[in-house]
Structure formats: structure tokens, C-alpha cells
Amino acid sequence: METTVTAVSGTTSSSVGHGAGGGAARVLLLPSPGAQGHTNPMLQLGRRLAYHGLRPTLVATRYVLSTTPAPGAPFDVAAISDGFDAGGMALCPDPAEYFSRLEAVGSETLRELLLSEARAGRPVRVLVYDAHLAWARRVAQASGVAAAAFFSQPCSVDVVYGELWAGRLALPATDGRALLARGVLGVELGLEDMPPFAAVPESQPAFLQVSVGQFEGLDYADDVLVNSFRDIEPKEVEYMELTWRAKMVGPTLPSYYLGDGRLPSNKSYGFDLFNSDVECMDWLEKQMNSSVVLVSYGTVSNYDATQLEELGNGLCNSSKPFLWVVRSNEEHKLSEELKEKCGKIGLIVSWCPQLEVLAHRAIGCFVTHCGWNSTLEALVNGVPFVGIPHWADQPTIAKYVESAWGMGVRARKNKNGCLKKEEVERCIREVMDGERKDEYKKNAMNWMQKAKEAMQEGGSSDKHVAEFATKYSSI
């Protein structure tokens, strides 16, 4: 197994904001390999750091860089290895084995990268690492480089994992009543609302370990950054600030959608692991305002054929035009009968530019798995939700969407754990035609404004980004 690092590129320079020239202080950004929802927010943080004068380098595995176009200016890119250079995580069906190999080989190749950059006269000031890769902090600091943890999920979920790590919450964590009583949660979480890794620890032990392990050595991190903002979850943010010294730097989305004129050309993430389908934009142009249901369940969540049939029939029965994103590796699960039925009222695509679609005037509702990145994308565009959570942080986020933020409803599964077409239809009609439809839209627009205020010049999150950049540009 080859373990030497391959550095890629190193000559691009920023074309936005203040700019980051060749002599600028360098910051390395290390997201979880192959996870679009972890990579996208870190890229946007990098763009903002470049605006403030730092020079960002995206660090990805060799496999990811071999299959994905480089993000372009203002980023340099560099490679490490996860031990599976030919195919990434897909070559290792055992998550525990993959995470172990990633730590072993990733640590070695990251160390080599940091040392080679120092020898070449390009020393790295700080490594911003995905908190799921806690081992990266040790590597950076042992190499004389500062380390900043980046949490890509909301503080509400961080509270649960942080308290599990600290031993103040026991497994299985089946409800959040104790956390609510202590004032560190703003919403009461029941069994169906808790992160399933914590509520049913035997279901995904490897993912539970890396989720709780985000807090390993966090006291020693030089900085702790979170992709959230104060107004959206104030009690949870306060917990992260007081307990873990965290700073909110979100929502880390392309600035075009945040009304931030400082980075006017920043309209996309620029590092897509999947190819978008532009046909859908032409189709949307033919639809009426706020009439279309966008249906997307992310890059990781999978559903069996029966559940997809129920979802598809529920969409059709709602009588609303819909844009349904079914990944190419999932399309074979759809029956020809369902495809024909869907084609009469909606459009099925393998992928779409989700942020651009959510900003389109025709979108009136978002049926989503409630991944945090997707949730923030809908939030900054004022789009109400139907939440159909699958795993990880999604059930907790769905609870907040419905109970704390009043932006939509959560679809309930039956006693057998199955989503039925009648429930899908009911939820869509509730959000788009029900008595509370205006309330959902009003709340969505309110949160949209608060999210934009946090990231615009002088906003709470914007200040934290600027302070972080100043700290490392002045060392």
C-alpha cells in the first residue's frame, strides 16, 4: 500500500474580495472524505477566509481528487490517502475498518504533507479539520501547526454527542428530557428525535464512535468552529460556546444566496462529487410561482424499492408538480409503471443544482431528508419543509424544523417503520394548501432573514470568521 503524499497544484490565487496572494498565510481545509455535505460548508468557509486574506488549500483523498474537478480559485488542492486510493470508502464495506485505515494512513500522509510544505517554504499556519477526523488535530499540532475543529452539524446534535463524551448522558440516549431541564436544549427530544447512533447504539457502532469522538481532545484544539448561527438555536449555541469555546461561523453557503455583496460571483460550491442535471432548470421555468415540490434525500441516504414506490405515489397523489432527484445508483429501484405515472405531473432527474433550484421562484415546498446542509440551503431561500429523516443528525433537525422553527412538518412512519404514500400526500398538502401554509412560509422567510444577517458584513457569524482570519494572518 502506497503511503507517500501527492500534492496537487499550488498556483491559483484568489479573484475575490481582498484576495490571497502567494505570500498570504496558508490554511488547510480537511473535510471528511467523499462527503458532499461536509465538503461544501468547508469550501465556503475557505472562500470567506480568502476574502480576509488567507490562502486556502483543500485537502482531499487521492480518490476524491481523481474523480472530481478541482474547485478553482481561490483554492490550492493537496492530496492525502485513506488507504483506498482506487475507490475510496466504496472499497471497504466495513465502516469501522475504513475509519481505522483512514486514521492510520491519513495521519501519515497528512504529516508528510505538512512537513513537505514547510520544507518548501510554504508553512501552514492552521489546519481546519472536520471534527469527525479528530486524529488530524494531533497530527497538526505535533507538526507545529495550529488546529481548528469544524463541526458540520447543528449545535442541537453537538449537545447530545458532547454530553455523551463528557459522561453526563448515558447510552442508549433515548430522550433529551434531562438536557431540556438543564437548559442546553430548546426543544424536548423524544426517541424518534434523538440521533439514532446514540438512541440505538448497537445499530451503527462505528458511526457512533466517530460522532462522539468529535469531542476527543477538543479541549486542546486551538479553535472550535460550528456551521450554525446564534438565532437559530440560541440555547444550544450557548452550550457550545461555554462548554467547548465554540464560535459560530454559519451558515457557510455561497454568499450570492446570503445577500452578501462582498463576494458577488460566489454562486456555487465548485467541488461537486455528483454531476448536476440542468434540464430541470428549463422545466422549472415553465412552472407557476411556488407551485413545485422539490424532492431530494441527499448524497448518502438510501431507500429500498418499496419506500421509493410509496414516496413516488404520494407525490403523484398530491397533484402538485414535482422535481424528484433520484440518484443514478437508485433509479433501478423505480418501477416502469411509477416512472410513467410520475412523468405525467413531475420530472425525475439524477441530480440537480440544489441551491439554485431552491432559490427558483417556482419552488413551494422541499421534501428532504433534513441533512444540515440541505436544511440551511432551504432556510436561506425561505422554502417550507416536509421532513423525512433517515439517519445521523436528520431526525433531530426534522424535530427542530417542525417544533422550534415552525417551517413545516415531519412525515411519520407507521408502526412497522414504513413511510406510506398517504402520509407523503398529507404532508405536502398540509404545507402547500393547509390552514398553516401562510404561517410556514412566514416563518421560513423570517429565518431566511436572520440567516442572512448572521453572515452579512458585521453579522455575528461574519465577525467570528473575520476574527479567525485575523488571528492566523497576524501570527
UniProtKB/Swiss-Prot annotation:
Signal peptide: none annotated. UDP-alpha-D-glucose binds at residues 38, 152, 299, 352, 369-377, 393-394. GO terms for cellular component: cytoplasm. Its EC number is 2.4.1.-. The keyword rRNA-binding does not apply. CDD domains: GT1_Gtf-like. GO terms for biological process: detoxification. Residues 1-17 have a biased composition (Low complexity). Residues 1-20 are annotated as: Disordered. Keywords: Detoxification, Glycosyltransferase, Nucleotide-binding, Transferase. The keyword Aminoacyl-tRNA synthetase does not apply. One of its GO terms (molecular function) is UDP-glycosyltransferase activity. Belongs to the UDP-glycosyltransferase family. This is UDP-glucosyltransferase UGT13248.
